[in-house]
């Protein structure tokens, strides 16, 4: 393990454009597994520094899609730049409103399920760090309706749904007993 203080994480959060992040000299589990032939994917909130040297593709992941820092650090807060949605190392969209934010869990889930299907015949490591249940709280309307307007409950239920979708993909591909 690694205590946060050992690598300069002294209680301050990594803000967009900051100079701090996961030290590139640290060896991650993704880097170790890659040396053993694993495909590696990360889909969701990274929040370990948004400089390219800190991002998932520089830390042992073959694939990445998600947000580079917390979903409360977005232009809706006015003091932060637009929150990018990144694939690989490229921003392919920006989170500009609550409707965009409500799609983050589903997007990570869809990427994870696709990754499982594409790598079903070889070893893989899948890391899915959801931004839920973290404020600000946004969720897809159908989930909010099902949760009777309770947004915290809706976010918990969506993460539960996501886990179920990932487990279903493993079962569908005959991998459930090989994890």
Where are these regions (language model features)?
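Formylglycine-dependent sulfatase
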Residues: 1-179
């Amino acid at each position: 393990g690694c205590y946060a203080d050992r690598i300069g994480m002294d209680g301050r959060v990594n803000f967009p454009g900051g100079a701090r992040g996961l030290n590139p000299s640290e060896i991650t589990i993704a880097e170790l597994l890659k040396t053993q032939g694993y495909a590696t994917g990360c889909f969701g909130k990274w929040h370990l520094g948004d400089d390219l040297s800190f991002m998932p593709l520089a830390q042992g992941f073959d694939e990445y899609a998600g947000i580079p820092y917390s979903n409360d650090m977005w232009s809706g807060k006015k003091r932060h730049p637009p929150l990018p949605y990144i694939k690989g190392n490229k921003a392919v969209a920006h989170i500009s409103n609550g409707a965009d934010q409500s799609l983050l869990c589903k997007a990570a889930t869809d990427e994870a399920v696709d990754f499982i299907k594409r790598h079903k015949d070889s070893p893989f490591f899948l890391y899915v760090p959801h931004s839920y249940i973290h404020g600000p709280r946004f969720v897809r309307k159908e989930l909010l309706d099902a949760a009777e307007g309770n947004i915290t409950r809706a976010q918990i239920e969506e993460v539960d749904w996501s886990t179920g979708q990932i487990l279903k993909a493993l079962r569908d591909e005959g991998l459930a007993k090989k994890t």
